[in-house]
Design a protein with these regions (language model features):
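Single conserved hydrophobic/aromatic residue that forms the stacking wall/gate
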Residues: 1-13
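Short alpha-helical scaffolding segments that buttress acidic/His motifs in well-ordered protein cores
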Residues: 5-8, 51-59, 135-138
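Glutamate identity and glutamate-enriched acidic tracts
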Residues: 6, 22-24, 35, 63, ...
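Alpha-helical structural elements
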Residues: 9, 23, 56, 149-153
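Charged substrate- and nucleic-acid-binding regions of tRNA-handling and nucleotidyl-transfer enzymes
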Residues: 13, 88-192
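Helix-loop elements that line ligand-binding/catalytic pockets
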Residues: 16-96
Length: 192
């Protein structure tokens, strides 16, 4: 084969070599992948740190959710059991250093914890070494969703305020009659 022909084949199949999921599968997945790549470009241009583990976690998030969905809800057992198979499938395409495996899993697990904002859980989540990366992924997930929720706004306020205001934020959730949308995990587009 000529070099030109090989280049054309690589361009045509570029998604196949990047990630082991089908970002075109849903509009939400496509938006999330696009937002993750834009975010990485923006961070790179402004000389902020860029971690391959974060990008891989974001790109594989739709694949992980796809593996653990059951009747429009996340099956938590499947969620935890699906992490390693999703990473192994990706490693057939792209080498992922071992040190990033735990980093990626931490970001994914924190997505669950970011939805739990009662009691001392928000303080524990905020102190986690991977909080910032998980927070950024949650913002990308929220940005990719058409139905906006206040999760990103809440966490932004929680991390920027002092302890008294943090308590008020937690209490404001208690005072609200927590309807079903606060009790479920994920954004509606993720659960299709």
């Amino acid at each position: 084969c000529s070099v030109r022909r090989q280049r054309q084949m690589c361009i045509r199949d570029r998604n196949k070599f990047l990630i082991a999921n089908e970002p075109e599968k849903t509009d939400y997945s496509r938006k999330l992948v696009t937002e993750a790549l834009r975010n990485t470009d923006k961070r790179f241009k402004t000389n902020k740190s860029v971690t391959p583990g974060f990008l891989i976690a974001a790109l594989l998030w739709p694949e992980l959710l796809n593996k653990c969905l059951s009747k429009g809800e996340i099956n938590l057992k499947k969620f935890f059991r699906s992490m390693d198979p999703v990473l192994r499938k990706q490693q057939k395409i792209t080498a992922i250093p071992r040190k990033f495996n735990s980093y990626i899993k931490d970001i994914w697990i924190l997505q669950l914890k970011l939805h739990s904002r009662i009691g001392k859980q928000p303080y524990k989540t905020l102190r986690h070494p991977r909080f910032r990366a998980a927070y950024d992924l949650m913002l990308l997930r929220e940005k990719s969703s058409t139905k906006k929720r206040s999760l990103g706004k809440w966490w932004t306020g929680f991390q920027k305020n002092d302890d008294n205001k943090r308590k008020l934020l937690i209490n404001s959730l208690k005072e609200k009659d927590l309807h079903e949308s606060f009790k479920t995990f994920g954004f509606s587009e993720e659960l299709r």
